[in-house]
């Protein structure tokens, strides 16, 4: 059985996620620019879907990188 470290959600239950809020979106991206799973970030299903859409939209608009160049 795999145990995941529970992270505290950075969002309140009714808070919406906006693609323009880059600082918030960066909290849910790994150093390899992958979106953190819902299991490990503590978001609800609805919030995770909003988060994924916002991150993808921010990447297309060049607000976030697709891949980090480290």
UniProtKB/Swiss-Prot annotation:
One of its GO terms (molecular function) is structural constituent of ribosome. InterPro entries: Ribosomal_bS18 (IPR001648), Ribosomal_bS18_sf (IPR036870). The keyword DNA-binding does not apply. Keywords: Chloroplast, Plastid, Ribonucleoprotein, Ribosomal protein, RNA-binding, rRNA-binding. It comes from the Eukaryota. The keyword Ribonucleoprotein applies. One of its GO terms (cellular component) is ribonucleoprotein complex. It is found in: Plastid, Chloroplast. GO terms for biological process: translation. Pfam families: Ribosomal_S18. NCBIfam families: S18 (TIGR00165). Belongs to the bacterial ribosomal protein bS18 family. Part of the 30S ribosomal subunit. PANTHER family: 30S RIBOSOMAL PROTEIN S18, SMALL RIBOSOMAL SUBUNIT PROTEIN BS18M. This is Small ribosomal subunit protein bS18c. It comes from Gracilaria tenuistipitata var. liui.
């Amino acid at each position: 059985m795999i145990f995941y470290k529970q992270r505290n959600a950075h969002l309140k239950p009714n808070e919406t996620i906006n693609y323009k809020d880059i600082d918030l979106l960066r909290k849910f991206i790994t150093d390899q620019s992958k979106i953190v799973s819902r299991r490990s970030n503590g978001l609800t299903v609805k919030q995770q879907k909003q988060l994924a859409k916002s991150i993808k939209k921010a990447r297309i608009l060049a607000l976030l990188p697709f891949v980090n160049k480290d």
